Amino acid sequence: ANDLPDAGDDDGPNGEVPAAYGWRRRWARQGVICDELSVSALALNLPASGEGLTSGVVFNHRRCGEPVRLTLRQLGDAKLEVPPGTLVRICENPSVLAHAATTLEGEAAPLVCVEGQPNSAVLALLNLLAADGAEFAYHGDFDWGGLRIATTVIERYGAEPWRFGVADYLAAAPAGTLLLDPPGAGATAPWAPGLVEAMTAHNVAIHEEQVLDDLLADLVEGERQN
């Protein structure tokens, strides 16, 4: 039992694969094949220029303005080689990426969708982009789960908030119809002091689909919106 692989490695965004991927690889070396295909990352228009299969897949999807879904297996040894300083926007919900692909096609700015709490494939993709020198801007749902996801991404990758502050919530709150549950003791938004208090006071959730026009405008203009 002492020889079993350890799943608890603390891998960071500096080019390393996330712990779950390294764990699968260590099992594989002992003859136990773990699933590298059931988790994937969704992206649009990443400016990859590296050699290899995965970079080529990303490049060709960008030429057509089409979303690409990459498995953990594809990402494990990939080198995307996006230009340093590339701003990659990150959203929580695939509907944002789908609308960007449909309406903007190849004109949309680079976008990654975490589809909830980031899985090991999403972390692997973001690690590769971070290692290439990409910068990140994050938007998610204004609800308690959305804040937890945002905290993970913003703290791990130093992402800028993208229309995800107090003023953005207050501007959208009048359109809110879904009531929030009580926030609980752990609710926090370190990048936006006062956001938890504003959400608690107004007691409505604002999901990305409700501010989709603003997000799409940023994606076509390529401008930073904090």
Which positions does each model-derived feature cover?
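Catalytic cores of secreted/periplasmic or lumenal enzymes
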Residues: 165-166
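Acidic beta-strand-to-loop metal/phosphate-binding motif
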Residues: 133-143
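Nucleic-acid enzyme cleavage-core boundary/entry regions
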Residues: 1-113, 118-131, 145, 155-160, ...
